[in-house]
Amino acid sequence: AESTEAATEEATVAEEADEIEELTVKEELGFSFGLAPSIGLVKGATFTNVPMGATLVITTPYGFKLGPLDFTISAAFGGYQGEFEGSAFNPSVMGVGGNLTLANFVFAEGHAGIVGEGTGIRGFAGVSLEYLMKKGLNLPVNILVGGEGFISTDVSGAGNTSGWGGLGVRLDYDF
């Protein structure tokens, strides 16, 4: 009878361990990947056509509170197609920065690094649909809509400071 009780107890402990392990696997790591296609609306003198392209943003779980704002560290990588008087060039974007979010609705993010051939910044600000997507619809994604802008000390390799801006729509996936 004792061996039957011990076997039952071991089976119960094993089942509980499996349940705990299963719960751990479903827990999010706090990172997100976001892809933001951008349609250019304004351009600097370096461009005859407004650049179009996309930026990939990797948001980390690392950050802190700044009063009512949530700050998180992120990195951005992107590629855009530009043109000046028939000559095509493709500025890339690589930067490290952060995101500020107010009430899971209004956001602003900035990244400093390389834009084209020079140092530069990327900014993206607007509204987040996080509350609707995650709380209302229980989806692991977020949609952000806003203005996106780029400024560089040397976009095309010609040594001139320029930039562009446009409308960005980003889809973030949390994992």
Regions found by a protein language model. Give the residues of each.
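Transmembrane beta-strand segments that form the barrel wall of outer-membrane beta-barrel proteins
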Residues: F31-K43, L69-Q81, F105-G118, S128, ...
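Solvent-exposed loop/turn segments connecting transmembrane beta-strands
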Residues: V42-M52, K65, Q81-N90, H111-F124, ...
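Mid-chain, structured segments of secreted extracytoplasmic proteins
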Residues: F71-L100
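Outer-membrane beta-barrel architecture
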Residues: V57-P61, G97-T101, F124-S128, R170-D172
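Outer-membrane beta-barrel channels and translocator barrels
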Residues: P61-L69, A103-F107, E130-N138, D174
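Short hydrophobic/aromatic-rich motifs at helix boundaries and adjacent loops
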Residues: L29, G95-T101, P140-V141
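Short glycine/proline- and aromatic-enriched beta-strand/turn motifs that initiate or cap beta-hairpins
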Residues: A1-L66, W164-F175
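Ligand-binding grooves and catalytic loops that recognize ribose/phosphate and carbohydrate rings
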Residues: M133-F175
